[in-house]
């Protein structure tokens, strides 16, 4: 996507509240609205915006639509833009699991606290914060739903639900930030109890592109 004559990679990862049909409905709403936003953004009239403004407007549009469901449908998301030439990341996190940085073989979280609630919760826009993070060449940003953490672990007679969010960092390192390998490492560690989706964005300036 192009904004103010600069090219950006756009990404979103979300997890709708609810089971079965309700959760699937939330995902469909997110996909439909997000596709509309992207289509509109391809029109030159809408390209003269700063990335922060684009994210704010996208959030407000999603917030308005999900809030119209009167509490029956919320969704957590990470929505972001990466400037292709500089690797500067702009993003919002609406009560989604923390964003992971994989740099030089080490995984860590780039967030320490979350201030924004799930999209659809009334008055959520008052807590909107557009966050920035400078990616370096070779960096990978990893985002995933809470299925990455909600795992049944241990032996059959003493199984418990994992409560250690740092375990996911270990899986990222073990899998060298490869999505398929990370998924396989998660399966070896425990039984997945919730929906799992994973997304990564890697900054490769030498290729003059950012891979997703």
Predicted features and spans:
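Conserved beta-strand-loop-short alpha-helix elements that form
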Residues: 5-21, 91-95, 132-156, 200-201
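Alpha-helical phosphate/pyrophosphate-handling elements in metalloenzyme active cores
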Residues: 1
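Acidic loop->beta-strand submotif enriched in PP2C/PPM serine/threonine phosphatases
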Residues: 6, 77, 112-154, 189-192
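Catalytic core of PPM/PP2C metal-dependent serine/threonine phosphatase domains
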Residues: 4, 21-105, 114, 128, ...
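Extended hydrophobic-aromatic, low-complexity segments
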Residues: 22-24, 89-90, 100-102, 108-112, ...
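GAF sensory/regulatory domain recognition
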Residues: 16, 107-108
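Active-site-proximal, acidic helix/loop segment immediately C-terminal to a metal-coordinating Asp/Glu
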Residues: 22-48, 135, 139-190, 206-212
């Amino acid at each position: 996507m192009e904004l103010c004559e600069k090219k950006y990679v756009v990404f979103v990862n979300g997890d709708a509240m609810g089971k079965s049909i309700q959760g699937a409905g939330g995902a469909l709403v997110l996909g439909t609205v997000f596709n509309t936003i992207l289509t509109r953004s391809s029109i030159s009239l809408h390209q003269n915006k700063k990335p922060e403004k684009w994210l704010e407007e996208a959030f407000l549009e999603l917030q308005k639509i999900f809030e119209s469901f009167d509490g029956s449908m919320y969704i957590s998301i990470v929505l972001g833009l990466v400037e292709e030439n500089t690797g500067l990341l702009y993003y919002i996190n609406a009560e989604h699991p923390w964003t992971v940085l994989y740099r030089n073989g080490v995984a860590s979280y780039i967030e320490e606290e979350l201030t924004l609630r799930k999209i659809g919760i009334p008055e959520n826009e008052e807590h909107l914060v557009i966050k920035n993070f400078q990616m370096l060449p070779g960096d990978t940003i990893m985002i995933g739903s809470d299925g990455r953490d909600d795992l049944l672990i241990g032996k059959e007679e003493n199984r418990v639900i994992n409560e250690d969010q740092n375990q996911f960092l270990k899986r990222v390192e073990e899998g060298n930030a490869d999505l398929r390998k990370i998924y396989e490492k998660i399966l070896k560690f425990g039984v997945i109890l919730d929906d799992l989706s994973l997304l990564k964005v890697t900054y490769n300036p030498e290729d003059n592109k950012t891979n997703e």
